[in-house]
Amino acid sequence: MDDNKRKSLDAALKSLDKTFGKGTILRLGDKEVEQIDSIGTGSVGLDLALGIGGVPKGRIIEIYGPESSGKTTLTLHIIAECQKAGGVCAFIDAEHALDVKYAKNLGVNTDDLYVSQPDFGEQALEIVETIARSGAVDLIVVDSVAALTPKAEIEGDMGDQHVGLQARLMSQALRKLTGIVHKMNTTVIFINQIRMKIGAMGYGTPETTTGGNALKFYASVRLDVRKVATLKQNEEPIGNRVKVKVVKNKVAPPFRQAEFDVMFGEGLSREGELIDYGVKLDIVDKSGAWFSYKDKKLGQGRENSKAFLKENPEIADEITKAIQNSMGIEGMISGSEDDEGEE
């Protein structure tokens, strides 16, 4: 760059710093790009699939899927992990359906959790913006986008048409929120539901998420949560096998996926993941129905081995570290070749 151009650019940069504050615009070569901070998900596999050890801080996240697929359970685990690291969390319960006892079972410190049950969508998003702008809250969860009903729709008559109101509300709110959460390093997670597209036929997925397209574009990470099997013991259902696909990721390679057990009343089974990934990486030995780690037998059968690890957390922690050391943060879970055509 010649001297005249450089002087003009320096003058423009000084003007921007004076108007908007120092660091408004930086040349990447002048400062090493900082490692993106993250909040753990409570799942070893999903942390690895996300590429940075969890969901990124200072970003908007969307977690979506069918009903009873494990979306709220996953977000409660993320809240618990954030609190363990000393973070402050807020839960915007637009569905008015938060089960406090279940949240406690999952490790959430409900005494320190800030909860709001807004009456309409504008109020919910105003609350999110206000507490995000404070800079004192690390994680905000909104459950769910489908329940963010505009005030005009609530106050109107039953048969009134309110086409596109919710989509416009979300678009307006997200335009404001994106800059705020980045500046304040606050993570905002929107839980969303799926709907069938009207008139969809022939090609592409017939499913879509509620609230218009704005969240798809503004979200740095989008997670698709699906139940893939029911777990049974003596023919009695005891939980679900859940698959999470990272369908969008702006902070690491997308299209990776993770599977884990969600046990009824207990939430995500960390022990089940340790056995699965331990066997996959030859950290845990499997001989017939028996599982063992080093010279210690964990148990006969997967459920017995899970119970052993639950009773011996020091061994579970040792296996966790071995898995993390073996896989690292970059090389983690193999992506699904079938997912390359997804968003």
Curated annotation (Swiss-Prot):
Pfam families: RecA, RecA_C. Transmembrane segments: none annotated. Gene3D superfamilies: P-loop containing nucleotide triphosphate hydrolases. PROSITE patterns: RECA_1, RECA_2, RECA_3. SUPFAM superfamilies: P-loop containing nucleoside triphosphate hydrolases (SSF52540), RecA protein, C-terminal domain (SSF54752). Keywords: ATP-binding, Cytoplasm, DNA damage, DNA recombination, DNA repair, DNA-binding, Nucleotide-binding, SOS response. Its main location: cytoplasm. It comes from the Bacteria. GO terms for cellular component: cytosol. It is found in: Cytoplasm. GO terms for biological process: DNA recombination; DNA repair; SOS response. ATP binds at residues 65-72. One of its GO terms (molecular function) is ATP binding. Belongs to the RecA family. Can catalyze the hydrolysis of ATP in the presence of single-stranded DNA, the ATP-dependent uptake of single-stranded DNA by duplex DNA, and the ATP-dependent hybridization of homologous single-stranded DNAs. It interacts with LexA causing its activation and leading to its autocatalytic cleavage. HAMAP family: RecA. PANTHER family: MITOCHONDRIAL DNA REPAIR PROTEIN RECA HOMOLOG-RELATED (PTHR45900:SF1), RECA (PTHR45900). This is Protein RecA. It comes from Campylobacter jejuni subsp. jejuni serotype O:2 (strain ATCC 700819 / NCTC 11168).
